[in-house]
Amino acid sequence: MSEQNWKQNLNLPQRDTRPQTEDVLNTKGKSFEDFNLKRELLMGIFEAGFEKPSPIQEESIPMALAGRDVLARAKNGTGKTASFIIPSLQQIKPKLNKIQALILVPTRELALQTSQVVRTLGKHLGIQCMVTTGGTSLKDDILRLNDPVHVLVGTPGRVLDLAARSVADLSECPLFVMDEADKMLSREFKGIIEQILEFFPKNRQSLLFSATFPLAVKSFMDKHLNKPYEINLMDELTLRGITQYYAFVEEKQKLHCLNTLFSKLQINQSIIFCNSTNRVELLAKKITELGYSCYYSHAKMPQQARNKVFHEFRQGKVRNLVCSDLLTRGIDIQAVNVVINFDFPKTAETYLHRIGRSGRFGHLGLAINLMSWNDRYSLYKIEQELGTEIKPIPATIDRKLYVADNEDAIPKPFKIEQLPKGNEKVHTRAGYEYKGQPEVQSGQQHAQQQLQPSQQPQQQLQQPQQPQAAPQGYPPAFNGYPPYQQYPPQAGGYPPPQFNGYQAAPGQQ
């Protein structure tokens, strides 16, 4: 392919023309060609829909390509994943059949997503990427490592297991990458990370990326990194494109409040967070009973079920996903424009990662927090720590705050080509039998189903949700509060914030 026309033959996706915020537009004007990348890598980058580097990519990619250790801090949804995948792919030698990059992430869903980004960007390089996580077949992973693997993406426990068995040879691996480094160096994972590093050569290169860097990261940096280049693009913690509201609601009125939000908001896709796995399952069932499409996911589900839910939600087969904090880390689904905290989080870190599931890559998003009176202390604390303002929910929410005029331009996520096979053992609390949750299949039939195109294109989700008739006796009466008809009808479904509870949705008064 000649020097002049190689770009003309690229299979480019539909251009994302939605407006973006300064979180990704405040760049120095560099292009990906300025980094002297391999042409095959540039082809993968452009065919994935990347047009120009974001600020974190401008800062980190040149330093990583120069061989420096990098400690980078940037907001959720600003392009951190490509910031370490692009230099990793540039440095890999496809003819050398050894693991040349290890990418560690805290959750299994994020491992699946990251591995697919590696495959998508590196599809013209002849690079083999393997994903390995807990909850999947160890035997299959061992067999897979008999074949060439250049990039290994996984969760810490499984990677340590494979390294300790001398199945995954990291002795000549030159590149160590940690995404969501603050979580990876928490008490939960830090000991495992220290053990994994013992299998690496001493002259390795380390790349650490996160939105927050607590003291644990500082101590790890002093011990294991070699004069790292530090990047901090966190002039403020929250994304500029996300509008945040709260509503004080009694616990028994939360479901009715959620129902009203569904009927009033123009939701493309939403993620609804709860603080416990039990509440995740119960809420998902209630939402399904109200007639809305809904899946759920939490850590106690079988891995195969989690993979299936994650894959179908990414592909736009369902509009709403109820989950625990399992999906607060790194999950990138551009179509999500609304995040609802059904249970208000206790820490600023959790809040920051939850709302960061909307407003991805400088686009618009909406975060709504349903709060009990006891949550007011957490609200004040989070506002102070993040330096942000969470406003009372207004009578009407301007759709321009969270809905782009050209929603058809939303890019489809990188399709996960094949999901790992789950363990044979099935958790007794699987919780995916009820109507609305996808059935989980196994073997070749399951793998083939993942390769079929979505039966419900993502664009179909852009119509407002239409609730079915509510169950008899729903919503419950407001104890001690004026009847619904005493609220002014012009409130448009959103009562003033001083009211505990929402006025009934149309047809339910």
From Swiss-Prot:
One of its GO terms (cellular component) is cytoplasmic side of membrane. ATP binds at A74, K75, N76, G77, T78, G79, K80, T81. Keywords: ATP-binding, Cytoplasm, Helicase, Hydrolase, mRNA processing, mRNA transport, Nucleotide-binding, RNA-binding, Translation regulation, Transport. InterPro entries: DEAD/DEAH_box_helicase_dom, Helicase_ATP-bd, Helicase_C-like, P-loop_NTPase, RNA-helicase_DEAD-box_CS, RNA_helicase_DEAD_Q_motif. It comes from the Eukaryota. SMART domains: DEXDc, HELICc. Residues 241-401 form the Helicase C-terminal domain. The keyword ATP-binding applies. One of its GO terms (biological process) is regulation of cytoplasmic mRNA processing body assembly. It is found in: Cytoplasm, P-body. A motif (Q motif) lies at residues 30-58. GO terms for molecular function: ATP binding; ATP hydrolysis activity; chromatin binding; mRNA binding; RNA helicase activity. A motif (DEAD box) lies at residues 179-182. Residues 1-27, 438-509 are annotated as: Disordered. The keyword Transport applies. Residues 441-493 have a biased composition (Low complexity). It catalyses: ATP + H2O = ADP + phosphate + H(+). Its EC number is 3.6.4.13. Belongs to the DEAD box helicase family. DDX6/DHH1 subfamily. PANTHER family: DEAD-BOX ATP-DEPENDENT RNA HELICASE 50 (PTHR47960). The Q motif is unique to and characteristic of the DEAD box family of RNA helicases and controls ATP binding and hydrolysis. This is ATP-dependent RNA helicase DHH1. It comes from Scheffersomyces stipitis (strain ATCC 58785 / CBS 6054 / NBRC 10063 / NRRL Y-11545). The lineage of its organism: Eukaryota, Fungi, Dikarya, Ascomycota, Saccharomycotina.
